[in-house]
Structure formats: C-alpha cells, structure tokens
Amino acid sequence: MFAASTASANDDTQYHITSQDDSLRDEVKKNVMLYLDDFSTPDTDNLAYWKKLVKRQVSQALQALGYYNSNITVSINDSATKPQVTIDIAMGYPIVIHQSHYQVTGTGQSFKPFVTQRNSYPLVVGSKLDHGSYQTVKNAMMDIARAYGFFDAKWMKHEIAVDLQTQSAAIQLTFDTGSRYTFGKISIAKEHASNDIIHAMAPFKEGDDFTSDAIANYNISLNQSRYFTSVQAIPALPNPLTKQININVTAVNRPRNIVEVSAGFTSNLGERGRLKWVKPWINRYGHSLESELELNKQEQSVTNNYKVPHGDPNLDYTNYVLGWRHTNNFNDTNNRYRKYSLQWQRHQQINEDWKRILLLKYEREKDNTQSATRTHLIPGFSYIRERRIGGITPNWGDRQFVQVEVSDKAWGSQSSFYKLSMRSNWLRQFNETHQLLFKLDVGYISANDVNQVPISMRFFAGGDNNLRAYDFNSISPLDSNNKSRGALTQLLGTIEYSYPVKDKWRFAIFHDVGTVGDKFLEDKYSDAGIGIRWETPVGLIRLDFAKGLQSSDIKRFDKPFNISFAIGLDL
C-alpha cells in the first residue's frame, strides 16, 4: 500500500493520502497535495459537508491530470489537536485523447516561432489528457504573440469535450495571430541635449517589426551609455488603427561634471591613488571627455580621452587619447623614463560577440638610464570579446583579447619591430558556490635588440594582476646596472579558486606562474597565496596575501611576500 503524510499550508489540518490498490503515482500525489495546500479548513462542525469539500478538491486535482473516474474515500478524525483527514484514492484509468484539432490562422501562421510551438504540441491523439499541458500550450502561443508584436492575437476556439463513457476526449484549438505591429516613433518625455543620442542608440527604426527583445536591448544600451542618471524606454499602448507601437523614453542626464576619487594599497607599491574627472556631455552629439590622474611611488600618469560616438556610443565610436607617463626604476628614485603619447582609436562592434579596435599612436619616450629619446609611429589593431553574468560582481564570464602593433622606419619610426599580445581569462561557477578563475597571458615582440623597443611596450611581470608575490613590474631580464629592463616575451598563468564563507564574502586560494625573458621559458617564477573577496555595490574588493615559491640569487626575488588590496574583478 502506498501512503503519504504531510500538512496543509495553513498548518491547521494534517492530511494522510493512501492508495489501497497501489495505483497512485508520484506526480498525481504531488498535484493532490498542491490542491490541498491551497484549501482552507472550513469553519464548520458539519463533517459531512467538510468531507464533500475535501473530496471535490481532490477530484479537481485528479481531473487536472486526466483522471475523471477515480474513487475517492475521505475520513476525518477531529478528536486530535489538529484535525486529521485520511484520503484513499483509486485513480482508475486516465482520459485518452481520441481527437485533437489544432489550427493556426492569420498573417503569422507561417511565422517560425508559431510554427515551432505548433509542431511541439504534446496533446496528440493517443496521449493522456493533461489540463496543465493544455493551458501551457495556450499560454505559450500568447507569450509568442506579445513578444513579437501580434497584439491582436486571440484564441478563436479552445475547448475540451470529455466523454466519460468512452474515457476519451476531443480537443479543438484555433489560434488567430492577427497582424504584426511595427515600431512607431520614439517620443522623449522632455527636450534633452541627448535627443540625438537617444534616437541613435535604438536598435530599430520606425516601421521595423516589433520585438520585445529589441526594447530590452534598447534599455540595456541606454543604461550602459553612461550619459544618464536614470533612463527607461517603455512601449506605448498598441494603436489598432496604424498597427504601430510608439516608444516613450524618460531620461535624466548625468551631472555636467563628475569627480571620482579612489585609493588602494600594496606592500610593494605602497599607497595608490586615482583622481578622475568626467564630462559626460560636451555637446548634443554625445561627445564626452575623461581626464584621469594616477599616482604611486613607481609610476605617475595623466590621460585625457575625448570620445566621439558614431551612432550607438556603446558600439561605434572614436577615441582621441593624449597621455603622459613618468616611471621610476625599481628601488631607485632616479627617473627611468617619461613618455608622451597621442592615440587615435576606432572602436567598432563587428558582431554580437567581438569588438574591433583600429589604432594609430605617436609616442615620444625619454629614457634617462640611456640618455636616449625615441619617437615611434605605431599602427595596430585588436579584437576583444567580453561576456559576463552578474553585473559588477559577476559569477560567470570570460574575456579574450588579441592585439598586434607594428613599428617601422619606413613611416618615420626610429626603429622597426612588431608586438603580439594575447590574453584569455575565464570565470566559471559550479553548484552556485564554487568559483574558478583561469588566466593566460602570452606576449611576443620581434626586434633585433630589446633597446629598440619603447620601454612602455616591453614585457614586465609582478603586481596585483600576475605573480602577486613579486613587486610591480620587477620581473624581467636585468640591464648592466642590475635593473629590470623589460623583455621580448612573456608567458603568465593563474588559477584561482574561491568559496563563499558568508553572505557577500568569499575565501580564495591562488597559484600564479610565469616567465618573462628575451626567449620563452628562460626564467620561471611562481607564487601561491590566499585572499578575501567582498562583493560590494562598487565592485569586488580583493585582499591578497602572496608568497613566492622559488629561491633566487637576486635578493629581491628570494621567496618574496606581498599584500595587495584592489577593487574590481580581474577578468
């Protein structure tokens, strides 16, 4: 005999479900309990009436799954603290579909989503009647209609005829899609300097077929543009005369001037500071300006970035970048070099996943250690794919980056070389708890002499984002003064595992390995460590403790230890 016992949702009555003939299936039992959970204990002393109500509730649960000839026996014991109801069920045979007619009419009858849904219709002749599946079919067609702009769609006929004598059912379904609506005009709540940009970011134009995905993507683009404090695009009511849907946009622009201040600390660089000044709006075309000052004891830099959008400012724009950078040699208060640069960058989203950047940069670099001044004109390109789920503290994502830069005396550079950089980072989460982060960074420079390559383009390792036990940019071949001079190749890797220990807090362990030299795999370095990750509204805060694993003849590389503090996931 099958028996089950559980309490109703109101916890005033305890139900025992039994099946003397062992016919009760698990799915049916669960459905009966769902119906009883929603059943309120009647306020009455009339046990006969109470039994009748319980029996009717159980009967409805069985009929929903196609069992119309079940035998239900109800007995009630009200002498206990909580009334106890015993229900014995003999399911009987289910209703079988002997006729099923399903027709789709209207202008959308050959529309692929409707056709796909129609072809997956489960209530075919010979199958068991299931009212849940029947309702799911109806809801699915209406969901498709709303998602793709068939706002006049309706069920012309939807009925089930059950014959208890023959234990059979006939289903009649006729769905009329009506006409498909198109996008109308974009209406902005009040006049904005941003009107042109708001229109340019729309992934549709007037007269295009309506889709709810287009509206969702439009809202994402508007909110990612960094022009607005708040912005929302909402479809108006469908116009049955024009068969169009206008889009209403409400937007509040960001302040004309924004100042951001941030700070960090590592045991090798000490305090770090950043001051950022942003003008989100320069004019009605969406031009913007960002100026950034970064300071630490090793490096100081100023960057000015003027952005000119061409259509959607998230996907298609040009950056003009003016920069100055001053870097000290490792453990040396003397200046290592100064660099002035001017860059042109053309950013374009070439497909759903990949972004392309064409670049041309002019660099003038003064190296005090060699009393040399070099100028280079360097064209190049890069391809980037970035995916993430979870906002500013993602739990899934990856980033792929490939870049090629070329310098040649033929167009006025002081030396000829080319540089290839590749990075691949992956973040994955398992069982909603375990997170793994993998990072691989490969670089190669083809040059006759490393001194022909600007210092800022050579490879160094060490710091917050790779080989964390080692000082910032301290790992590279050494010059005649025993100072890091940069390298022509690099190969770096990281594996990191983190586990939640408290809400918003994760414990991490990691292992970094790498080599930086004029040839691949010349010298190998590695470290291991532990860290704390804290998810905050401003991003992921990382605190790491890293210890080097290799001994070295060079004192500063002999099993170093560093503490680093940073904001943001290194993805």
Would you name each region that the model predicts?
Residues 4-6:
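N-terminal signal peptide c-region/cleavage motif recognized by signal peptidases
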Residues 9-29, 36-267, 276, 290-308, ...:
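Periplasmic polypeptide-binding modules associated with outer-membrane biogenesis and secretion
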Residues 106, 328-330, 406-410, 549:
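A generic structural motif
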Residues 493-496, 525-533:
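Short glycine-rich, acidic/polar surface loops and turns
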